[in-house]
């Protein structure tokens, strides 16, 4: 249908992450925006963009509490993310091994709940993280019965191994957040860099 009616159709795509637009060379995002007639966004401005308001959490800003666990959120890139189709071993080497070391250290200091980040239709992220990080016997793996906001709001602090929408969400909820990732794996564009500098300087 789309092929037959492509000249008479309007294609609308939408932003599916708060940090969508931060990277200088992220081909999937650039492709979506290039082929779309309109782009629904809640942060980035351009000719094609329909601006939407930011999501507002219904949970109150986090106050000091006596919660005793660390919520450790993982997102491990697939080999396709690195564009090395013949080198899937780069995923644990570049992304997962450093996280494993930190997770092992933190779990010795405080009860730790591992929450692999589920992506609809991409279960490879969840099972791989469970298998890889499950080597650490001290951690508890979250079963996702509670949503992320609930788990984060009831944690003493949150650690995230990728700078993504999840990190922005915990920061907006006033939750102590550590972003643990190799900054060399993300090449930020000039617009995003300005906002990141503001975030770094914020107190």
Please place each PLM-identified region on the residue numbering:
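Donor nucleotide-activated moiety binding/catalytic core segment of transferases
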Residues: 113-168, 172-173, 178, 182-184
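Short, well-ordered alpha-helix to beta-strand connector turns
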Residues: 8, 36-37, 110, 154-156
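Short, charged, surface-exposed secondary-structure boundary motifs
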Residues: 21-27, 48-51, 60-63, 82, ...
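Conserved catalytic-core segment of nucleotide-activated headgroup transferases in glycan assembly
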Residues: 52-132
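Catalytic binding pocket for nucleotide-activated donors in carbohydrate/polymer assembly enzymes
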Residues: 35, 43-51, 65, 74, ...
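Short, aromatic/basic amphipathic alpha-helical patches
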Residues: 2-4, 29, 123-135, 189-196
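Structural recognition of alpha->loop->beta junctions
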Residues: 30-45, 130-142, 196-203
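Active-site and donor-binding regions of nucleotide-sugar-utilizing enzymes
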Residues: 1-56, 166-167
């Amino acid at each position: 249908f789309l092929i037959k009616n492509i000249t008479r159709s309007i294609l609308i795509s939408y932003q599916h992450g708060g940090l969508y637009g931060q990277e200088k060379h992220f081909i999937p995002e650039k492709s979506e925006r290039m082929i779309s007639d309109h782009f629904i966004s809640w942060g980035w401005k351009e000719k094609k963009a329909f601006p939407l308001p930011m999501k507002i959490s219904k949970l109150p800003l986090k106050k000091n509490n006596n919660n005793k666990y660390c919520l450790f959120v993982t997102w491990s890139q697939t080999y396709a993310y690195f564009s090395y189709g013949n080198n899937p071993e780069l995923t644990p080497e570049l992304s997962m091994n450093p996280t494993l070391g930190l997770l092992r250290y933190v779990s010795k200091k405080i009860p730790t709940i591992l929450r692999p980040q589920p992506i609809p239709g991409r279960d490879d992220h969840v099972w791989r993280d469970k298998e890889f990080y499950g080597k650490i016997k001290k951690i508890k793996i979250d079963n996702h019965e509670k949503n992320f906001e609930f788990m984060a709001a009831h944690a003493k602090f949150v650690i995230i191994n990728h700078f993504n929408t999840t990190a922005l969400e915990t920061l907006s909820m006033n939750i102590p957040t550590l972003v643990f990732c190799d900054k060399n794996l993300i090449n930020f564009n000039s617009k995003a860099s300005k906002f990141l500098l503001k975030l770094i300087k914020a107190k």
